[in-house]
């Protein structure tokens, strides 16, 4: 049975810079957007806000939905990745709460697009999607019957 990993990611932008999280995987420091898996009993928007806080210490809500990517990782793991935009008025300090995150960095789009240490090609693709200017209302991915009604199934 096909069971893709459902993940969320946040393109966080402030003062012309983008927020990336740095984590060490197999001895190499890699950049990613604040991102992670959808957990039971949370919406996609809630998951995005939670992952942002866990990985950066920033408490903010997504303002827009950007895109959903269907991706097969090199190890053949399938992903459905929901990408959100978060615009902050100014660059703010970060304090990761997730021990997997080494640090956070505010960098330019050019630095991300030219980086050789991206966790996946979706990191650069997310910046390109953000730069395209396409934004969708969060209601586009509305919740049905939320919270789940007990005894329905």
Swiss-Prot record:
Enzyme Commission number(s) of this protein: 3.6.1.-
Oligomeric form and interacting partners: Monomer.
Encoding gene, per UniProt annotation: nudJ
Superkingdom of origin organism: Bacteria
MF GO annotations: nucleoside diphosphate phosphatase activity; ribonucleoside triphosphate phosphatase activity; thiamine diphosphate phosphatase activity
Cofactors demanded by this protein: Mg(2+)
Family as reported in the entry's similarity comment: Belongs to the Nudix hydrolase family. NudJ subfamily.
SUPFAM superfamilies per the UniProt record, alphabetical: Nudix (SSF55811)
Protein name from the UniProt record: Phosphatase NudJ
CDD domains: NUDIX_Hydrolase
Location of the motif Nudix box: 36-57
Residues annotated as transmembrane: none
Annotated Nudix hydrolase domain residues: 3-131
Swiss-Prot/TrEMBL keywords: Hydrolase, Magnesium
């Amino acid at each position: 049975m096909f069971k893709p990993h459902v993940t969320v990611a946040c393109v966080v932008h402030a003062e012309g810079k983008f927020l990336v999280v740095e984590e060490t995987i197999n001895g190499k420091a890699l950049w990613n957007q604040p991102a992670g898996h959808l957990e039971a009993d949370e919406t996609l928007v809630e998951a995005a806000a939670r992952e942002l806080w866990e990985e950066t210490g920033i408490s903010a809500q997504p303002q827009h939905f950007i895109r959903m990517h269907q991706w097969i990782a090199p190890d053949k793991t399938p992903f459905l990745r929901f990408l959100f935009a978060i615009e902050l008025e100014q660059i703010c300090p970060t304090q990761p709460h997730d021990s997997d995150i080494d640090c956070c960095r505010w960098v330019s789009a050019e630095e991300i697009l030219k980086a050789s240490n991206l966790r996946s090609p979706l990191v650069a693709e997310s910046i390109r999607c953000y730069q395209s200017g396409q934004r969708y209302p969060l209601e586009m991915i509305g919740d049905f019957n939320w919270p789940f009604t007990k005894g329905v199934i």
